[in-house]
């Protein structure tokens, strides 16, 4: 064969120990008869990137040191014993020689002239007429793609896999008694021997070095594990043995202690075992406390609250009122329900709603727990340890709702809704009472609601029939996306006489149209409390008038807690006297004076809700 670039570039294929291989003889194919075949020249394009030195250098690692100068090429095809000349085109040579390198032991009876590109998949047609006992000898023409070559033969079309060097013809042919019969047997045996090795090479090239595992730094606050009973005995006896034998090594001391432990009585061993058991119990307690502390400092934690018995009356959070344009404050949670402060300052909107899981009324609350050092400036702490979160973009659709557990679930909402209300509504637990002062018409506005004591108890004494407040159109929920800081909460509170209220369950809700003025008194706007099962609301003294049954008395209440009284009281706010039986006021008032004062308060509240900018004086 002749390569371009010079007349001296002839490849001499020799086999010194084989009688058929010599440079001066033509090649004979024993399997096909005595026909003579001329070796066709390989015509290569004048590609500057491909030279004879590159082809030969690629097979240098596959050649045997004892072969001749051009033995690298013969070593490549030495496994095939060169029964037939193999014609390769320029497209096959461009693959870097990785396709048939290192001992593909199939006898190729026809020249492979298929052009190959670097883009997979590539189909290779290999005639296998003479390989009857080979790997795929059942088919005369087998289609092999790139993935099969890579997985079964360990070959790579890109030439990236380095295969082990093939056995030289001298080593293989020297032990062959009959060259005619051993041509195919040697090829099949070599193929089977090299197949596992090639697979191993492919697997090894795909492995990545694993990074060494870094040991976690041990927390100094983590409790230490207790030692065993033998370790306690070792500590006790080591000092005595060292005192007697100061030159004894650690191994000698260990042997002495082991013999002493074996000869120790069972009762004495039980003493050390009891110490170990006690230490284990202390360790488990300390470990549990340590884990609880770690979980408390986690970023997000889902907690399932235990159901509160119906007989108990939990303390409700502070009752607040909000203007329509101002957001309702986020729900507050008592420290008795959670050891950590619950706050969510990253969400742009909240929906305060209580979800009950199952008929048992057991709520599931998802809480974001943040340490006290990370609390933002928008959080104000009350004296009772409660936290009120008022983010800049908090809006609610269902408002502040309080159930049997006096907690509210904070849930994110992409587009929250705010509904204005014309009647003071707030959730409360049953079987409790609370005195709160009614509002005056124009007191100085407060920038933030003062937090009442945490142990307030609220009840409702009377519930009117469901009605639309102020005879206005049906309520509508207005969607608001607050992009800027909303105005601060404003409320108007004055100390008036006390108000007596009763507790009841409200099947309906009293709503009003969102057409109320923005600067109206805050008692006309509050947050609705709803739940899937029950509706507990605190409506401050709602009593229908004789002239207009739709008129309602709305009062903002905030004051000190009062004790529960089983006896009924006068309905008028601030009156502690029991009601007098009379058909004129339905056994609800103690005197005519209370009836007149109560009607005046109701009328003033109604006028204020209708005309918030006007001042009405009733004498």
Curated annotation (Swiss-Prot):
A GO biological process of this protein is: positive regulation of transcription elongation by RNA polymerase II
The record's annotation in Pfam families points to: HMG_box (PF00505)
Protein's name according to its UniProt entry: TOX high mobility group box family member 4
Q: Provide the alphabetized UniProt keywords.
A: Chromosome, DNA-binding, Methylation, Nucleus, Phosphoprotein, Transcription, Transcription regulation
Function statement: Transcription factor that modulates cell fate reprogramming from the somatic state to the pluripotent and neuronal fate. In liver, controls the expression of hormone-regulated gluconeogenic genes such as G6PC1 and PCK1. This regulation is independent of the insulin receptor activation. Also acts as a regulatory component of protein phosphatase 1 (PP1) complexes. Component of the PNUTS-PP1 protein phosphatase complex, a PP1 complex that regulates RNA polymerase II transcription pause-release.
- Residues bearing the modification Phosphoserine: 178, 182, 315, 531, 548, 550, 558, 560, 565
What is the gene name? Tox4
Q: Where is the composition biased (Low complexity)?
A: 320-335
Biased composition, class Pro residues, residue ranges: 436-453
Keyword Transcription regulation included in the entry's annotation: yes
Task: State the organism of origin.
Answer: Rattus norvegicus
């Amino acid at each position: 064969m002749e390569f371009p670039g010079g007349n001296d570039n002839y490849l001499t294929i020799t086999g010194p120990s084989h009688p058929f291989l010599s440079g001066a003889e033509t090649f004979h194919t024993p399997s096909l008869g005595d026909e003579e075949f001329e070796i066709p020249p390989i015509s290569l394009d004048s590609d500057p990137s491909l030279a004879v030195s590159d082809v030969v250098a690629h097979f240098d690692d596959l050649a045997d040191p004892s072969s001749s100068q051009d033995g690298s090429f013969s070593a490549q095809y030495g496994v095939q014993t060169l029964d037939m000349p193999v014609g390769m085109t320029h497209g096959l040579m461009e693959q870097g020689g990785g396709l048939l390198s290192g001992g593909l032991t199939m006898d190729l009876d026809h020249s492979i002239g298929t052009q190959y590109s670097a883009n997979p998949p590539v189909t290779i047609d290999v005639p296998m007429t003479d390989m009857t006992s080979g790997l795929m000898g059942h088919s005369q023409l087998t289609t092999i793609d790139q993935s099969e070559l890579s997985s079964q033969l360990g070959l790579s079309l890109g030439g990236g896999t380095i295969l082990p060097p093939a056995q030289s013809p001298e080593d293989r042919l020297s032990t062959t008694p009959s060259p005619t019969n051993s041509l195919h047997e040697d090829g099949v045996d070599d193929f089977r021997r090299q197949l596992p090795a090639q697979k191993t090479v492919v697997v090894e090239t795909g492995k990545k070095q694993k990074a060494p595992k870094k040991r976690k730094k041990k927390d100094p606050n983590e409790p230490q594990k207790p030692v065993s009973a033998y370790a306690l005995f070792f500590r006790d006896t080591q000092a005595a043995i060292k005192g007697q034998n100061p030159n004894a090594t650690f191994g000698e001391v260990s042997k002495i202690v082991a013999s002493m432990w074996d000869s120790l009585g069972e009762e004495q061993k039980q003493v050390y075992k009891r110490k170990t058991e006690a230490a284990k119990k202390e360790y488990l307690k300390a470990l549990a406390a340590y884990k609880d502390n770690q979980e408390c400092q986690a970023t997000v934690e889902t907690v399932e609250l235990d159901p509160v018995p119906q007989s108990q009356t939990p303390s409700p959070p502070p009752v607040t009122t909000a203007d329509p344009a101002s957001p309702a404050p986020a729900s507050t949670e008592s420290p008795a329900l959670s050891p950590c402060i619950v706050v969510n300052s990253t969400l742009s909107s909240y929906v305060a709603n209580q979800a009950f899981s199952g008929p048992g009324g057991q709520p599931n609350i998802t809480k974001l727990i943040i340490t006290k050092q990370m609390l933002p400036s928008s959080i104000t702490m009350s004296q009772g340890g409660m936290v009120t979160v008022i983010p800049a973009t908090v809006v609610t659709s269902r408002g502040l709702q309080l159930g049997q557990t006096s907690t509210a679930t904070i849930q994110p909402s992409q587009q929250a809704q705010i509904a204005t209300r014309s009647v003071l509504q707030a959730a409360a637990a049953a079987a409790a009472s609370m005195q709160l002062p009614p509002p005056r018409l124009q007191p100085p506005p407060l920038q933030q609601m003062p937090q009442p004591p945490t142990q307030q108890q609220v009840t409702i004494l009377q519930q009117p029939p469901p009605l639309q407040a102020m005879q206005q159109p049906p309520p509508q929920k207005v969607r608001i996306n607050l992009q800027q800081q909303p105005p601060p909460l404003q409320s108007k509170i004055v100390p008036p006489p006390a108000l007596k209220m009763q507790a009841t369950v409200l099947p309906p809700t009293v709503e009003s149209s969102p057409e109320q003025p923005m600067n109206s008194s805050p008692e006309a706007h509050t947050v609705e409390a709803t739940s899937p099962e029950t509706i507990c609301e605190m409506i401050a003294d709602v009593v229908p008038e004789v002239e207009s049954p739709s008129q309602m008395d709305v009062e903002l209440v905030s004051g000190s807690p009062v004790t529960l009284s089983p006896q009924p009281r006068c309905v008028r706010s601030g009156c502690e006297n029991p009601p007098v039986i009379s058909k004129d006021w339905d056994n609800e008032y103690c005197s005519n004076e209370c009836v007149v004062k109560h009607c005046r308060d109701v009328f003033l509240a109604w006028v204020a809700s209708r005309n918030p900018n006007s001042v009405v004086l009733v004498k």
